Amino acid sequence: AEMAVRASLTGHKVYSTIHTRDPREVYFRLEDMKVEKYLIRDSLVGIVSQRLIRLLCDNCKTIIDEKNIDGKVIKLYEKCGCNECNFTGYKGRSLVAAIHVIDNEMKEKIKNINNDNSLLSNLEMIKNLKALLINGNISLLDYENFIEVEGLSFEFKKESKL
């Protein structure tokens, strides 16, 4: 890990995959790998956090409720099952992602990452997930399960309330 960080500091582009539950853990994982904090801050230029979620089959999804979300009445769907989706209720997947650009301002903020849970959070992923729900691409149950399975902290659950 330290060799990759040092290579990035000499101008080489280094891409790596670190499997973590959220972008904050990337920073802490590099610390656990004995990379100095100042080297982490100086070498990171971005973190992409991504997950896949199953999409409801447009052919058979069923309306179960209507709710007022952000001033708009939206239809909530649940999976059903048909020949087109092989009776699963799902057809295809969508990417739910967040991109964190580590600019000079963020590098300064990262110095206090232990005291600020909002830094490098998955909140952007929740906003993207909410858009899929509002557009009728996923069910409310899948939305809630995603939040639960991803282990998002309480603050982000509050933000995601419908």
Sequence positions of predicted segments:
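Short, flexible helix-loop junctions that flank or precede catalytic/ligand sites
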Residues: 1-162
